[in-house]
């Protein structure tokens, strides 16, 4: 049998190249949530509570002028038992710039409606919410999570923490196997 000849097929007519796709439109900027009108907030704290809050407020005063910077508001609100996210604090503050956060100062009278706004927020997680969130990482089902995994989660998911913040939070929490009892950890966090 004779070898087959390699018959070349005529090249198909080249189709014109499609026009390049237009660049995708930039994603619309997420609108900032409107700031909370602090003047409309009714203070519901007792006189005794307000005195305690003022005492705590003054502990954060670094210059002796009875004022704090906006960057300290979240720390004081949390020290007084509330648990707002940084985004919630920014909304309460009116979404200030980084420069304003470090430069602008407020008095206790300006701070009190901010604290009340945080206290009025009902979306704060409970002990059970936090434990349930950590239970997902409990591979053994024994009430513990790996410290390294928890560090990674805290630094990369949700409202990300810096390495320094993570280390400060986890100080003294790991056992000799590098595991953390997450119920005790949540109690620790909620008491800080």
From Swiss-Prot:
InterPro entries registered for this protein in UniProt: CALM/Myosin/TropC-like, EF-hand-dom_pair, EF_hand_dom
Swiss-Prot/TrEMBL keywords: Methylation, Motor protein, Muscle protein, Myosin, Repeat
Query: At which residues is N,N,N-trimethylalanine found?
Result: 2
Q: Which residues form the EF-hand domain?
A: 48-83, 86-121, 125-160, 160-192
Membrane-spanning segments: none
Q: Where is it found, in Gene Ontology cellular component terms? A: contractile muscle fiber; myosin II complex
Location of the region described as Disordered in the Swiss-Prot/TrEMBL record: 1-34
Composition bias, Pro residues:
17-29
* GO molecular-function terms, A-Z: calcium ion binding
Give the record's GO biological process terms. regulation of myosin II filament assembly
PTM characteristics: The N-terminus is blocked. N,N,N-trimethylalanine, found in other myosin light chains would not have been detected in the N-terminal tryptic peptide in PubMed:6709041 and PubMed:7238855 because it would remain trimethylated and ninhydrin negative after hydrolysis.
- PANTHER family membership: MYOSIN LIGHT CHAIN 1, 3, MYOSIN LIGHT CHAIN 1_3, SKELETAL MUSCLE ISOFORM
Query: What does the annotation say about its assembly with partners?
Result: Myosin is a hexamer of 2 heavy chains and 4 light chains.
Q: What is this protein called?
A: Myosin light chain 1, skeletal muscle isoform
Which species expresses this protein natively? Gallus gallus (Chicken)
């Amino acid at each position: 049998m004779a070898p087959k000849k390699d018959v070349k097929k005529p090249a198909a007519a080249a189709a014109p190249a499609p026009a390049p796709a237009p660049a995708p439109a930039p994603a619309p900027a997420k609108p900032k949530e409107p700031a909370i009108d602090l003047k409309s907030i009714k203070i519901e704290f007792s006189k005794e509570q307000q005195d305690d809050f003022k005492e705590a407020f003054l502990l954060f005063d670094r210059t002796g002028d009875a004022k704090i910077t906006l960057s300290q508001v979240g720390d004081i609100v949390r020290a007084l038992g509330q648990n707002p996210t940084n985004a919630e604090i920014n909304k309460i503050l009116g979404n200030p710039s980084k420069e304003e956060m470090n430069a602008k100062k407020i008095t206790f009278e300006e701070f009190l409606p901010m604290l009340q706004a945080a206290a009025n927020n009902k979306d704060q997680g409970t002990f059970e919410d936090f434990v349930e969130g950590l239970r997902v990482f409990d591979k053994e089902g024994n009430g513990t999570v790996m410290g390294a995994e928890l560090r990674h989660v805290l630094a990369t998911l949700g409202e990300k923490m810096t390495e320094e913040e993570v280390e400060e939070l986890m100080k003294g929490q790991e056992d000799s196997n590098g595991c953390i009892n997450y119920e005790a950890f949540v109690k620790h966090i909620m008491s800080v």
